[in-house]
Amino acid sequence: MCCFGCSPNTKEKMPLEWIDKIIEESTQIDTVETIGFSGGEPFLEYQSLISEIKHAKSVGKKAICTSNGFWGVTYDRALEIVSEIQEAGLDRLSLSVDQFHGEYVSVDRIKNILRASSEKSLPVDIGSVITKNRSKLARIFDELAEEMVNVPHYTAACLPVGNAYTQIDKSDLIYDDYIFSRANRCFETTYFAIFPNGDVYPCCSQAGATEPLKIGNVQEYTLEGLYRKYNSNMNIRILKSEGLNWYLNLAEKIGYRKFFNEKYVNKCDLCRKIFSDKQFMNEINPYLEQEKEKIYAKYLETVRNDK
């Protein structure tokens, strides 16, 4: 997943040569099936977006994109753009629609895009982020009722990261009161999120960019090299096999109670808190080494059995 960092308030964006490099190198890894373009707002770099969608399709990958829909000014303009991105090879368009985006992008623009996508048979879905005080989606979707037929809609609680960390009061967040009784397994570590500075993380969650999970940087490694680093990262392996409860159980074992005294929006929020805690991560290093030894022992046993 290539994350364009283009919004009106930042000049940072991923160089096109990096994106071309990533797409070309993706052909060496069969498990990479889809290239996603996000942001920021990728449609602010429209011609580059069209070019990279074509590039992704030319090497046999699916192409998806996320947008706030600012460009659906009229139905004719929406139809023109939908036709162009579909012709370029876009497989799915995701729209961000909620009260936060609604302050800047009118419902009429979203309606134009949904109608145009329906006419061109371009698959589209909608994602919404809510807080306690910004959860009034009924008015928005009442206006989109007809256009929403056969359009999947996903709702997620706002995470306290980025601007939300400084601009949204903690009392407005929607917390999971039962987080510690859940399995907290992670099924999201199958994506590469690539940031404008080239840093790569194994997760597309806004809360996933923590140092222990960082895989590397596209300036330093090929995608194949990053994939090897992904497979050798012990924290990623544990998240996939055991989930966050491995860390919570370990915290309880060593008497590290800090995590149990806070509230969390969801497991992504909990994940961010755990992996951002340098003291805790330092204290559990010996246990990570033990896990490495267990994995290596299993590998040796498998080799012996194969003989």
PLM segments and residue spans:
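Canonical Radical SAM [4Fe-4S] cluster-binding loop centered on the CxxxCxxC motif
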Residues: 1-17, 29
